[in-house]
């Protein structure tokens, strides 16, 4: 069997290695248009910031190591420019010489990835404007920063890579402004959870311009102007365009393969395209949302690696299947961590799901052990079935651990109240005897058994309009003074028993 793989990095490289482990006799050829066949693109911002000092650490495999370890032929700086399905061949262009040749295949795996979105606007040709997707992009940005020593940078977009780059530039002493068309950063989070991230960036000196659209760029002597709708242009020494990515599916489209959401390549659960001899994996493919069943894009390294493995398995006769993505994600925001899995409220509403949400802010470990800090957990579950729909956590230490527990619970089909019964590891430096995940389960259980009723901030307008309703804030005096909602009276919880007479027994209390 001869297998040609178009693209390396996560999906293609994983497929190649898995194929070799399953079939020693297969002929495996990888064509990669960049100069690096397998690299840690999630680590690119940290190389720019100097956190990762040795760029070789970002290179996971080289053509030489692929050949020596796996007997796989890898050709970098080679781009597949056409697929000829009728004769099962691809046209390959050597990007260094311009020469073209054909390579036949028995099976073809497409892993072209995604491209940074570059909308039609003026100034995209400026040498002071960058995107970040490849090692070459990284080297270009780092070289610019080291040589030009920019004092200001404007970053358009509020996604993972862009925010990680913003943090690293800020840590290098660059004054950073983030321009985001939406009213929040990090769309996997709901706005209430993203507000913690906004506050952290602002506390670190990063300027946020939300609900602001970039309309173009203009290079001037020694600077680049970022033009925004309804405002004065922003002057900086460099700008980064990070407004998202789109699936690089042009090769598949020209070959007549079926496409799906946003032009992504349509695949089945075995990662087969509409041509049974062609598979596709990674950021270019359409995947099923494991919670809602809807089809869309998930541009994350974890799913891409798993898809590469599944495609290789199926090629070799194994019944592996990809059952959808929970899109579990995590990001470092200076000393803070934000993470999400499953769907958020916006997606739940779009899917027409009837859901309940709970929000809690426990400490990451035992309160008496030094260094404890609060994390905020937001959990969504379906009202009727009680299945967990999604979760978001923002905090400091221990956020990543808790989001992984919740992602596992979702995939295992656990119901929200069952989180109360999870037997999780405990020692004072790491957790509490009642772990934050258990506490989320306790709250869900109390709600569903009728022991507790809850209301949310968005319910306040309605509650205030009702006659005879008392609004009670049981936080400490200091917490109340630091900020409270209008219309609430403050009776600290520890004083409540002694002050019950201040409440009207004939009025509902919220």
Model-derived features: positions:
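Beta1-alpha1 glycine-rich phosphate/pyrophosphate-binding loop at the start
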Residues: 1-79, 117, 166-189, 328, ...
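Mid-to-C-terminal Rossmann-like scaffold of FAD/NAD(P)H-dependent oxidoreductases
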Residues: 1-2, 8, 284-397, 428-432, ...
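A Rossmann-like FAD-binding core segment of flavoenzymes
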Residues: 25-27, 69, 75-96, 103, ...
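Rossmann-like dinucleotide-binding cores of NAD(P)H-dependent redox enzymes
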Residues: 59, 152-153, 160-218, 298-304, ...
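Short hydrophobic core segments
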Residues: 103-113, 156, 234-244, 308, ...
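Glycine-rich dinucleotide-binding loop and its adjacent helix/turn
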Residues: 110-172, 207, 267-269, 489-499
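Positively charged, proline/Ser/Thr-rich regional signature most characteristic
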Residues: 121, 459-510
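FAD-site-proximal beta/loop scaffold in flavoenzymes
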Residues: 125-149, 232-313, 405, 409, ...
């Amino acid at each position: 069997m001869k297998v040609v793989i178009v693209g390396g990095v996560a999906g293609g490289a994983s497929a190649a290695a898995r194929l070799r482990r399953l079939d020693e006799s297969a002929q495996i050829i990888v064509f990669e248009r960049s100069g690096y066949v397998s690299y840690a693109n999630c680590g690119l911002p940290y190389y720019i910031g100097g956190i990762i000092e040795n760029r070789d650490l970002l290179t996971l495999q080289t053509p030489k190591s692929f050949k020596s370890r796996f007997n796989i032929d890898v050709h970098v700086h080679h781009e597949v420019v056409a697929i000829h399905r009728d004769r099962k061949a691809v046209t390959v262009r050597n990007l260094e010489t311009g020469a073209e040749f054909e390579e036949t295949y028995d099976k073809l795996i497409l892993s072209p990835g995604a491209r940074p979105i570059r909308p039609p606007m003026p100034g995209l040709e400026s040498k002071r404007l960058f995107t970040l997707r490849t090692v070459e992009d990284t080297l270009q940005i780092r070289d610019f920063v080291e040589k030009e020593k920019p004092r200001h940078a404007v970053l358009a977009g509020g996604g993972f890579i862009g925010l990680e780059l913003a943090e690293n530039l800020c840590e290098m002493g660059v004054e950073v402004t983030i321009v985001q068309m939406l009213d929040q950063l990090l769309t996997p989070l709901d706005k209430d959870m993203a507000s913690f991230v906004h506050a952290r960036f602002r506390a670190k000196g990063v300027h946020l311009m939300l609900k602001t659209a970039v309309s173009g760029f203009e290079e001037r002597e020694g600077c680049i102007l970022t033009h925004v709708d309804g405002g004065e242009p922003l002057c900086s020494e460099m700008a980064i365009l990070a407004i998202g990515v789109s699936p690089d599916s042009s090769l598949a489209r020209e070959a007549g393969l079926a496409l799906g959401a946003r032009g992504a390549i349509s695949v089945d659960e075995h990662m087969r395209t509409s041509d049974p001899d062609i598979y596709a994996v990674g950021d270019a493919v359409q995947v099923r949302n494991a919670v809602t069943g809807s089809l869309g894009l998930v541009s994350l390294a974890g799913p891409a690696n798993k898809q590469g493995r599944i495609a290789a398995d199926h090629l070799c006769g194994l019944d592996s299947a990809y059952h959808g993505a929970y899109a579990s994600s995590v990001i470092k925001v200076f000393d803070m961590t934000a993470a999400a899995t499953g769907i958020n409220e916006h997606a739940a509403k779009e899917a027409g799901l009837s859901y309940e949400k709970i929000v809690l802010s426990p400490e990451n470990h035992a309160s008496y052990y030094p260094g404890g800090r609060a994390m905020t957990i937001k959990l969504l579950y379906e009202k009727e079935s009680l299945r967990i729909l999604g979760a978001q956590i923002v905090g400091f230490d221990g956020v990543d651990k808790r989001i992984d527990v919740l992602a596992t619970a979702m995939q295992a089909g656990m119901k929200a109240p069952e989180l109360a019964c999870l037997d999780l590891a405990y020692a004072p430096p790491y957790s509490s005897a009642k772990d934050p995940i258990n506490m989320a389960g306790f709250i869900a259980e109390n709600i569903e058994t009728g022991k507790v009723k809850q209301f949310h901030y968005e319910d306040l307008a309605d509650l205030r309009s009702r006659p005879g309703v008392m609004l009670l804030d049981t936080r400490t005096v200091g917490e109340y003074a630091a900020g409270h909602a209008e219309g609430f009276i403050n009776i600290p919880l520890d004083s409540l028993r002694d002050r019950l007479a201040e409440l009207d027994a004939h009025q509902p209390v919220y």
